[in-house]
Amino acid sequence: MSKTNKSKSGSRSSRSRSASRSRSRSFSKSRSRSRSLSRSRKRRLSSRSRSRSYSPAHNRERNHPRVYQNRDFRGHNRGYRRPYYFRGRNRGFYPWGQYNRGGYGNYRSNWQNYRQAYSPRRGRSRSRSPKRRSPSPRSRSHSRNSDKSSSDRSRRSSSSRSSSNHSRVESSKRKSAKEKKSSSKDSRPSQAAGDNQGDEAKEQTFSGGTSQDTKASESSKPWPDATYGTGSASRASAVSELSPRERSPALKSPLQSVVVRRRSPRPSPVPKPSPPLSSTSQMGSTLPSGAGYQSGTHQGQFDHGSGSLSPSKKSPVGKSPPSTGSTYGSSQKEESAASGGAAYTKRYLEEQKTENGKDKEQKQTNTDKEKIKEKGSFSDTGLGDGKMKSDSFAPKTDSEKPFRGSQSPKRYKLRDDFEKKMADFHKEEMDDQDKDKAKGRKESEFDDEPKFMSKVIGANKNQEEEKSGKWEGLVYAPPGKEKQRKTEELEEESFPERSKKEDRGKRSEGGHRGFVPEKNFRVTAYKAVQEKSSSPPPRKTSESRDKLGAKGDFPTGKSSFSITREAQVNVRMDSFDEDLARPSGLLAQERKLCRDLVHSNKKEQEFRSIFQHIQSAQSQRSPSELFAQHIVTIVHHVKEHHFGSSGMTLHERFTKYLKRGTEQEAAKNKKSPEIHRRIDISPSTFRKHGLAHDEMKSPREPGYKAEGKYKDDPVDLRLDIERRKKHKERDLKRGKSRESVDSRDSSHSRERSAEKTEKTHKGSKKQKKHRRARDRSRSSSSSSQSSHSYKAEEYTEETEEREESTTGFDKSRLGTKDFVGPSERGGGRARGTFQFRARGRGWGRGNYSGNNNNNSNNDFQKRNREEEWDPEYTPKSKKYYLHDDREGEGSDKWVSRGRGRGAFPRGRGRFMFRKSSTSPKWAHDKFSGEEGEIEDDESGTENREEKDNIQPTTE
């Protein structure tokens, strides 16, 4: 039934989707009520968006069937709503945020619209009256959009709804209200397509109905599988209340699902008094009453989906026809809201009323069929149900025949298409149920067949034609799927084609039945069947069945299809057997023949020995093939006799080459292991050793040595690459911290001035510290620093400057100054003390936000002084200067800047001030910096800052 529910919820899904548009209401009514009206109301109220997608799970317990039900317990935040859909990055924790919704962005398979979750619309949807709107095209389209998820929920809801009479009754109520609306809407659409409800029921059933038929076929899949077991069981509970016909609707295949919905109206002849509920209501009430129980569920869902059911239900008397026509028509109609017609509804109701007698008779027929079915094996029961479905549909067909007569051929065509689809569905059902169907259906067809014989013949013939194509491959496909497939195919077929097909099938079947044109037959058959339908139809059906049996299973299949409308399952099954025996069988045979012809050689050779195959192949060889073979033979002969082989196999030969190559490679590798080793060594490691050691050896010379080394090493691509990397990185960093670096540079320049005028030793000690720190950081910095060191040194024209660079970036920037200072500084003074360092800290501060004079310097200067002078600092300086407006200063002044600290320190000063301002410490350092010696007048303030920085650092 899950599938039945699926299909029901398929069509109902459209409805339910329409209804589901406000499924909260829909569900709250049907599902919620099944759970409890209070809860549904509460849910409706509390969960504005009871809609499957948006209401918080706790509010949407009703929707538990949903796979996502997790969200029921996941807070309406990202959790509840989304069944664990990944929230995605920018979703934040916004529970319902549009794109913050749980379902990725706009992912709402079932979700109506994310905004609907909270949107008043959902609230409105919750409100039942708005739900009534749900059948409206908007709802419908919405339903279609959310068809899958809606159908999922609808299916679950369907199951729920069908499970709970309460829900079903509510469904019927809702249907009565909704379907009244629907029937109004559907009636309007029906009027729009006066014929359209019957035909549209078919056409829509074929188009939208096909989807619904497909859904129905899904539905019917379960019911064929669980023909009586599941479908019948759940429907049987409903059906038990209703006549066997009702039950057969319960068991009906896709149409049966639909028919079940419609059939409930059919049984609704009994509930017919409940037409006041509106057909839908009747159907709902009927459905609740019996087959309506499940049918009602289906119908409730279906009716939900198709207000059109209400028209069919309006003539609940026309049990199957209303059910099928109404359900499918309604389904279709709801989907094609524009296509219904009130006139059609009236006409259809009248016809169905006319048919109601037939339906009742057909119910009897169904009962007979059911009995027959019951007599038959369980499959027979399924077949009986199929028959009953066919019968159910047959009454519909009968109803629809006058319907067709009264309504335009389009109605026929649609109806025919629908029947064709039904036939396809039922045929596929008949695949599984065909044999049983043949038994039960023929019996049930006794009742229904006269009515539907021609129709069934036409429809079934069409089905068989399609089926012959399909049955060949699909013969044993699950009827539901097959039906779906066929329905889809039929749907794909233009309705005219279908009509033609059906007419053609019926004409060919007409030979069997005598009714040639399906449309005419349907009109005639409907009228005649209505007349015959009472009691003669069963006999005629039996006779037809017998005839079909005599004619072959196929005609029965066809009449089965008519009956398939009435007792579709039976018809289906017969169709299957008959398909094989009859046109379908003939087609299958023809196809087999064609296939065999196509693959005849294969088949023949299949069992031959390989030698036979070879012989046949040789005999079949073309001259060119023979010529080529001849040449090949000659070549082999010549090679064998005239060209002796070296005795070495190809493998050996190539192995030899490989060995040679390997040996050569090994030799090459052995030749220059150091190159590889050096390359293998990471530049940072290399630099660590080279720079750190050189720098540590002597602050000045290491700068030289390192610089010389790296200058020599510039050949080392690692350094070059590292240099580039570091330069780029530093350029970026400098771009960012250019001010910082510039401040550093200015700090360095100022520091140079300060150092020159001031304590070089402080600077030296400090820079030694910094240099060591920088050596560490530089080693960590890796080659780029070393490269920078090289560049720095390269840029540092003076050795002293280079040493100072080595001593620190500050020094290189400071310039030569007293390079005794660098040594002294490096050796003697703690960086912190040195104002130069303060400046370094200043620039360091610039980069490091001047956390520590020493630390800032260490941060920057921690790159070993070599680094500072080396790449990061001097080249950085150069780079900064290249990038900076002070570029001329940067490159040229670097060398002279220490000396020409005046100009540079000013620039530095600017940066320094900026830096100092940047660093909270700067103010502190500035004030405490006064302690430091401000020897550089130019750098005075900066020196002061740097002093402050340095001194605090030192201090």
From Swiss-Prot:
Keyword ATP-binding: yes
Sites of N-acetylserine modification: S2
Biased composition (Acidic residues): 930-940
Swiss-Prot/TrEMBL keywords: Acetylation, Activator, ADP-ribosylation, ATP-binding, Biological rhythms, Isopeptide bond, Methylation, mRNA processing, mRNA splicing, Nucleotide-binding, Nucleus, Phosphoprotein, Receptor, Transcription, Transcription regulation, Ubl conjugation
Domain of life: Eukaryota
GO biological process, one term: positive regulation of DNA-templated transcription
Keyword Nucleus carried by entry: yes
Tissue distribution of the protein: Ubiquitous.
PTM annotation (Phosphoserine): residues: 220, 232, 237, 240, 243, 248, 253, 257, 315, 320, 323, 326, 339, 377, 379, 406, 408, 444, 468, 535, 560, 562, 575, 619, 622, 672, 682, 684, 698, 928, 939
Protein family (similarity comment): Belongs to the BCLAF1/THRAP3 family.
Protein name: Thyroid hormone receptor-associated protein 3
Species this protein is from: Homo sapiens (Human)
Taxonomic placement: Eukaryota, Metazoa, Chordata, Craniata, Vertebrata
